[in-house]
Amino acid sequence: MITRLPDLTTIYTEEGRQAFTGAQGALADARYTLTLKDDLLLAELTAEQTPLCYLRLRWHFTPEEKRAEPVRIYGDAWERAGGNLEWRGIVPERCMPWFALVSNGTDAEQAREGRKTEGFGVKTQPGAMCFWQYDASGVTLWMDVRNGGRGVVLGGRTLRAAEILFRTYENCTAFEAGQRFCREMSRGVRAPKHPVYGANNWYYAYGVSSHDQILEDARIAAKLCAGNENAPCMVIDDGWSPNPKNGPWDRGNSAFPDMPGLAASIRAQGVRPGIWVRYICDEDHVCGLPDGWHLSYNANYLDPSHPGVLDYIRQTTRRFVDWGYQLIKFDCSTQDILGRRGYKIPYVIAEDGWHFHDRSKTSAEIITNFYRAIREAAGDDTVLIGCATISHLSAGLVELGRTGADVNGMSWDITRRMGVNTLAFRMMQHGAFYDVDADCVGITGEIPWAQVGLWLDILSRSGTPLFVSCKPGILTDAQLAELREAYARNSVQRDKLIPLDWMENICPERWLLNGREIHYDWFADDISVMFAGKSL
């Protein structure tokens, strides 16, 4: 299907809605314009005082566009996936954020002749929160242009809501088509200057650590990575700030008395220091910031549309850089801003009835500006990991994107479900939007090595970043040797890993590694059971 004008366009305001059939239409002082150029469809909106909520575009399939053969559909996620990415049949009510792929056949046997995959998407960093719906008669794009849970008041300016593209890829696998489509949607990737990998203390320490323990973690990482082409990172996760999962971010707590000194000591071991931060959180107003800087619906969190908040975020970021940290992992911003985790967001991103401090911008614009403020303050030499960031909005602004919900150092079920799924299904975005971070390998001794070793192995061979959270002193010599080999492989990230049975299995076991098929049996040892979503 080629990119073309929709058959029906509907404007939704706080006062009502109206449908149109042309490239332009107006409701009160609100107007939309659709422009075809260079195989893209630009959707723009303008209004003076009318609060705008949604723009809906509907394409009815012509007989030539309608797929006659059976197809399966892939839909992406707002931010991190929750172990729920999959190819499905036609589900008209399904919400597919950002883009959808529609394909015949299967990737399992790598047959290409007669394959046809269509992509329906928007370019990265749009001005609206966009999702697709696909049914037997057509395809629909919804653009949420609200400001929080109220209509945006543009004040006469023109909003570039989205640049829309349809693409068709023939005689290639669905995975290959997905890779090509992600590259076409991308406004440009911000690739790290070196492969990013190493240690992160979260999945064994869970916030209980210290200056000395981090130095020991860094020493172990340096020893295991000795001789590698690229130096590893040591990411200090939550637990260093005065309040757990909260600021202020201008100093450490009693267990972390000297954050600049800690960064210097990590670097002295030949390891790149990294730090975790939760910018938006200000529970109980511990950061000492003005009351007017907080979200109207929840005063425990900062409002990223406020100029003072953006300045505070820039200052905090510059402080980390001045302290000597070469990697910043910023976390939890989607749930802190919108009130729920990305993989639990249904059709609309925010509940009705509230708005940001600056009501003239859409939620998508406000969140993108928040990411951009961090990027500008971090500079070109600092690696940013966007954790729980909105995928399409952070693309091009961060080097790494955490693409799945948390694995778990204590539960193989959670690790397998969250980790393997996001690695398989978000791999096509790797190198197009950012480097895909499918999360860490948590080594605590609670999960048998037969299982956690599989997760370590596939991540190390994936060509995507490998981070390991390993409790010191629990590995045998043989296991340490495996970890050393995994780090060595991942320190260059030249491998090409492709899921094969991903169209039939949301936890793929068949993979293509550098052109050779390999298998992973994720269920070989029945060490735990998921029943009704809980481990028994």
Labelled PLM ranges:
Residues 438, 470-475, 498-502:
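Short coil/turn segments at secondary-structure boundaries
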Residues 458-494:
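Catalytic cores of secreted or luminal carbohydrate-active enzymes
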Residues 2-232, 327:
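Carbohydrate-recognition beta-sandwich/jelly-roll modules
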Residues 220-223, 227, 241, 281-282, ...:
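Glycine-rich, acidic and aromatic/proline-enriched surface loops and short helix-turn segments
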Residues 38-39, 459-463, 467, 500-536:
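Carbohydrate-binding surface patches
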Residues 156, 162, 456-459, 466:
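Hydrophobic targeting/anchoring helices
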Residues 202-204, 239, 446, 471:
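Short strand-loop junctions, especially beta-strand C-caps/beta-turns
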